[in-house]
């Protein structure tokens, strides 16, 4: 799509979300028969409107295996932006994904809360995450309800859904 075509579509379709569409298409390709469970932040809670939520939401995919695959919405440019069109990175240049070994319905939304905290950190400090990074945490369990011994995070590229262009 050319810059002119992009601008025309942006004007003609004010609720167009090319970044979100691209993310959904990538996950639909990987999980073609799965309808994700979506969690959206309230519009008035989003940082863009004065709130403290830096993500628009999450989608949780049942993989048909022994884990759920979660993707965030909001670390990359979701909505049309002439400034982002053709740029090297779309907003922060990535969405976060996480694979968790149990259903969010069984254990609450701890993984979504953790991803929201990581997004808040990035937006407030300007520090973003790259593959190979390690987040040590404070020594306490990331999931105390389950009695997990995991106390930190290793940042890796998603091996299930390949990187995509969102703008």
Cite the ranges covered by each PLM segment.
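Short linear motifs embedded in intrinsically disordered, proline/glycine-rich low-complexity segments
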Residues: 1-167
């Amino acid at each position: 799509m050319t810059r002119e075509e992009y601008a025309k579509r942006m004007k003609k379709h004010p609720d167009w979300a090319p970044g979100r569409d691209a993310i959904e298409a990538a996950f639909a390709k990987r999980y073609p028969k799965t309808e994700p469970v979506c969690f959206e932040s309230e519009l008035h809670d989003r940082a863009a409107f004065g709130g403290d939520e830096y993500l628009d939401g999450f989608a949780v995919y049942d993989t048909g295996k022994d884990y759920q695959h979660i993707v965030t919405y909001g670390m990359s440019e979701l909505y049309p932006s002439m400034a982002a069109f053709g740029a090297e990175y779309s907003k922060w240049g990535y969405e976060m994904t996480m694979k968790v070994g149990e259903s969010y319905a069984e254990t609450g939304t701890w993984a979504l809360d953790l991803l929201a905290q990581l997004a808040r950190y990035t937006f407030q400090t300007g520090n973003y995450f790259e593959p190979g990074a390690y987040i040590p945490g404070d020594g306490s369990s990331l999931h105390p309800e389950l009695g997990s011994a995991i106390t930190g995070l290793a940042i890796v590229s998603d091996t299930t859904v390949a990187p995509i262009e969102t703008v």
